[in-house]
Amino acid sequence: GEKLGYLPGDMKDKVDPYMQPLYDALNDFLPGKQAAKLIEEKRIEIAPLAFMRGRTLANAFVVLDEAQNATTMQMKMFLTRLGEGSRMVVTGDRTQIDLPRGVPSGLRDAERLLNSIPSISFNYFTSKDVVRHPLVAAIIEAYEADDPPT
């Protein structure tokens, strides 16, 4: 992950810019200040991947976003936090990996290692699934035509 130590402010100030896409999505789905209220009540928690170490996430719905940039060890650490009564969703785009050269994507490794486990499924989206601006689908298709996904 990104280095947070050099950013100004307390930990919340440091991580909030990275969490903004999640706040945006919550605000799209929950009316008014409902998202803020649920976060304040700790019924919804948004935390950096590094904060998951040592935890067990029981009776929870857990989302790891942008997982293409998790290392293999980060992915293993995250997936092994699964507690009783919980579900996990891991999202990521294999075409947007920006880890340093030679560092494998934990998302790709998880696909390879876990695809035969019956209770784990992988779902893949195409440009037809884009819900952003219509041009985004065309942009994705142009990049795919130039360099097909692996």
Set out the residue ranges of the language-model regions:
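Conserved helicase motor core of SF1/SF2 NTP-dependent helicases
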Residues: 1-64, 68-150
